[in-house]
Amino acid sequence: MNSLEIFLNIALGKNKFAILVVEKKKIIFFKEQELLNHGKRIIHENFDEILRKSILEIEAKFRISLNKINLMIEQEILESVDATIKKNFENKKIDKKSVEYLIQDLRFQVIKSNPEKQFIHIIIRKCFVDDDEYNTVPIGENCKVFSVEICFIYIPKKFLEELEFFLKKNQLDIKRIISTNYAKSLLNKDTENLGSAAVAVTQDINLKEVNIYRKNRVKYGFFERIFRIFV
């Protein structure tokens, strides 16, 4: 069953924990439970116990050894940082490498300025060429000024570190961190369906999103997508 994807969703405002198993875009296991709230802290021994029991249940049911999960965080209000970066092309042609470096530079600046934040999604908002908005990056076109607006979705790094402590206790690594709020926004309908949201975000539906991997590494292949279309 190598095609199984495991999703762990933590709803911060609702103090709920859900675990899903997805196979070929189909939800084949779903379990949701309440979490005890110790003040503002919901990630504690209660979570550890529920997580351990859920892991054992899934491993027994599907005869697998569970060691990686997709972590989904559902916030009361989506938290993000918006930023813009420009480059003067001096009436030269726009080239792919310059655009790549431009976006990477903005990403590094935002991360450096916000050390307490863990950025989990990077979304291309708009692209401008000499103040004209474009739906695609016009590679090869002469340009004075090129600019791009980007949204950086984040969760508090302290919360993530606390959560990772309990995951490691259960021999679990994080494959991908997902904003549940953002994942639900990708759906055309039924936006409260957690299972559909989990599936949607793994299918790279939003071509404007930069793929982020653990250890702050960006999948450079995303640039091939932003040159095609903005949605």
Regions found by a protein language model. Give the residues of each.
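Nucleotide/phosphate-binding catalytic cleft detector across ATP-hydrolyzing
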Residues: M1-N15, E23-S65, I73-V231
